[in-house]
Design a protein with these regions (language model features):
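Short, extreme N-terminal segment that most often corresponds to the first beta-strand
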Residues: 1-21
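Generic structural motif
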Residues: 9-11, 23, 85-89
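Acidic, low-complexity intrinsically disordered segments
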Residues: 35-89
Length: 89
């Protein structure tokens, strides 16, 4: 099972979080993108833009942050953090 933890922070305080599970046979990239899309829908947010720095952090650490600059719409938090909790190999 693949699980992605999505958290929103403001002033270093956790505002809201959710965990998205994916049992499909998709590739890891598809699972990440689909889970992020589901989390954004759940939290009523637009999907963030993946910058080169964000992609590199995610590839190395299985964790990354999307700042307000990563969103087209104005957001009411400082950053969104995503982290892979569990993966199928």
């Amino acid at each position: 099972m693949f699980r992605l933890w999505v958290k929103l922070f403001k002033d270093n305080h956790l505002l809201i979080d959710t965990t998205i599970c994916d049992d499909t046979a998709d590739t890891r990239t598809h699972k990440v993108m689909n889970s992020l899309e589901k989390a954004c829908y759940e939290m009523d947010l637009s999907k963030p833009i993946w910058l080169d720095n964000t992609i590199k952090d995610f590839q190395i650490h299985d964790k990354c942050r999307f700042t307000a600059d990563s969103f087209i719409e104005e957001v009411s938090f400082d950053y969104m953090e995503i982290q892979v909790l569990e993966e199928d190999y």
